[in-house]
């Protein structure tokens, strides 16, 4: 994607040199949290016909176009970024009060992506009104926003974001967190949370654990997510007359990973900063410390974003997993856990982090070879099961074909989950907006695997997978579940992968 000129007032010395894509110099209307929005106008006017913002805002903010979120504000810290927050406004839009909160977070080293809930709900409404509209996976929208902005502003590495929402935004970010696979977000911070919210007529997918009941006002009343693994902090004013503090306490008490920060002198408007700002900074810092603390890595591979899932099995095999472009999250975590439960230790290479910068097939193969040599020795194993999911599946055949002969001989199986027709060796915005596909073709690389046992797994209705079209006899094929996520049938995936490696023959 070509760079576009013009980027409104990024603070000098920031790590981000230029934004890619469409930029806007529109500024947000200045108001207070909880204050009523200005009179409704056309969507274009909402983005561009605002009052000027304070000078403090122009010292930090740039605006870019971000799909369903419309124009988003991006705030850059003075030094190297330490974390990323995606901040969704209340019904009043991206105004002075939430802008001040964003500035407070940049002082903690955060890049803050500020989104106007009015733009987002308008997009949801449009999607919901289409004939045969499916349920909406709002977690994917927030994840894509984080990916896009971090890539466009030139972040040197990807940071798993914290979700923050005020008022109506507080409810929406809770829903996104409950939907999301583990590892997608660092957690969420909800300021002024109510369980009921109008999602513009959209039905929400359950995802990893979101449940709700529609009420007579056509709102969705969200339920506590008992299985929520990522931390959720309800930041609640005890004088809030819009969202009951007692109701929030009762809601959070049913979620094991939830905390409530009680603010005795605060109402729904969060108007007096001294009554909540210290606690706000502290709550955010707790979420970022939890996710950003680097795990200790073996010296031989300490430059690689690896994740170990040990196991106590006495077998002679381990698994190496190349993740999808979402990183170490969701299916990748669940599959690794299932393999480990069967006695097969697993190490993952986080594709989102590793391919954040461009790689070559040879470079990737060299790094995977380093991982293999390390774990063959460290774990005392003789064979390896190579597994790739989605982005990682596209890359994996290129890697195997470039491994040294001694390592290639120890590959028990190559397992391609959701492989596409083309591979990419750099995470790009096109991968998230569905316009990728210009990379090197995967079919010739799969064919070149020769006598190496290959299992190609696809979901029912998965139109992008090359598995069904591969020549019969050369590659074993298996259809599991539905779609690109295999209906969450992780146990079946693990069972099929292990069975194939131990008895390498075609699977139908």
Describe each model-derived feature in a short phrase.
Residues 118-136, 325-327, 350-362:
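Cap/lid segment of the alpha/beta-hydrolase catalytic domain
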Residues 198-253, 310, 424-474:
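The feature captures the conserved acid-bearing segment of alpha/beta-hydrolase catalytic domains
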Residues 131-155, 358-379, 398:
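Alpha/beta-hydrolase active-site loop
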Residues 46-80, 272, 278-314:
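N-terminal cap/lid segment of alpha/beta-hydrolase-fold proteins
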Residues 113, 255-271, 347, 472-487:
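Catalytic histidine neighborhood in serine/cysteine hydrolases
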Residues 271-286, 488-500:
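Post-His helix in hydrolase/transferase enzymes
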Residues 152-153, 157-218, 383-440, 445:
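Primarily recognizes the serine-hydrolase "nucleophile elbow" in alpha/beta-hydrolase
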Residues 78-108, 114, 312-342, 350-351:
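Short, surface-exposed "cap/lid" segments of acyl-processing enzymes
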């Amino acid at each position: 994607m070509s760079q576009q000129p013009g980027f409104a007032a990024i603070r000098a010395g920031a790590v981000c040199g230029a934004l890619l894509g469409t930029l806007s110099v529109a500024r947000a209307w200045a108001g207070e949290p909880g204050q009523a929005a200005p009179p409704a106008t056309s969507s274009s006017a909402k983005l561009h016909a605002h009052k000027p913002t304070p000078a403090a805002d122009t010292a930090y903010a740039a605006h870019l176009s971000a799909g369903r979120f419309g124009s988003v504000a991006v705030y850059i810290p003075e030094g190297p970024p330490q974390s990323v927050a995606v901040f969704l406004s209340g019904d009043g839009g991206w105004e002075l009060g939430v802008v001040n909160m964003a500035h407070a977070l940049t002082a903690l080293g955060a890049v803050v992506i500020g989104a106007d809930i009015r733009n987002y709900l308008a997009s949801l409404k449009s999607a919901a009104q289409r004939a045969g509209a499916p349920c909406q996976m709002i977690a994917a929208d927030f994840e894509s926003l984080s990916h896009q902005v971090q890539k466009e502003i030139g972040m040197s590495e990807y940071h798993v974001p914290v979700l923050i929402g005020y008022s109506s935004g507080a409810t929406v970010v809770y829903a996104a967190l409950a939907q999301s696979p583990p590892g997608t977000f660092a957690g969420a911070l909800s300021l002024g949370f109510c369980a009921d919210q109008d999602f513009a007529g959209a039905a929400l997918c359950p995802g990893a654990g979101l449940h709700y009941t529609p009420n007579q006002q056509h709102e969705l009343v969200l339920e506590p997510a008992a299985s929520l693994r990522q931390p959720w902090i309800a930041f609640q004013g005890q004088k809030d007359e819009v969202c009951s503090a007692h109701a929030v306490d009762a809601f959070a008490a049913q979620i094991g990973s939830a905390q409530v920060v009680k603010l005795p002198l605060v109402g729904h408007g969060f108007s007096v900063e001294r009554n909540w700002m210290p606690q706000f900074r502290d709550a955010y810092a707790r979420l970022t410390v939890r996710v950003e603390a680097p795990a200790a890595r073996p010296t031989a591979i300490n430059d690689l974003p690896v994740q170990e899932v040990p196991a106590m099995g006495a077998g002679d095999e381990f698994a190496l997993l190349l993740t999808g472009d979402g990183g170490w999250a969701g299916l990748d975590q669940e599959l690794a856990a299932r393999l480990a439960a069967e006695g097969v230790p697993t190490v993952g290479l986080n594709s989102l982090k590793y391919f954040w910068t461009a790689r070559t097939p040879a470079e990737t193969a060299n790094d995977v070879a380093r991982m293999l040599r390390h774990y063959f020795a460290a774990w005392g194993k003789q064979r390896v099961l190579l597994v790739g999911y989605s982005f990682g599946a596209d890359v994996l055949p290129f890697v195997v074909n470039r491994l040294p002969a001694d390592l290639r001989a120890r590959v028990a199986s190559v397992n391609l989950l959701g492989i596409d027709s083309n591979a990419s060796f750099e995470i790009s915005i096109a991968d998230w907006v569905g316009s990728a596909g210009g990379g090197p073709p995967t079919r010739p690389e799969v064919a070149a695997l020769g006598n190496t046992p290959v299992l190609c797994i696809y979901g029912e209705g998965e139109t992008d997978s090359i598995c069904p079209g591969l020549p019969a006899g050369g590659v074993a094929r298996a259809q599991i579940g539905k779609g690109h996520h295999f209906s969450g049938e992780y146990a079946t995936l693990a069972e099929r992968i292990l069975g194939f490696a131990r008895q390498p023959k075609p699977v139908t």
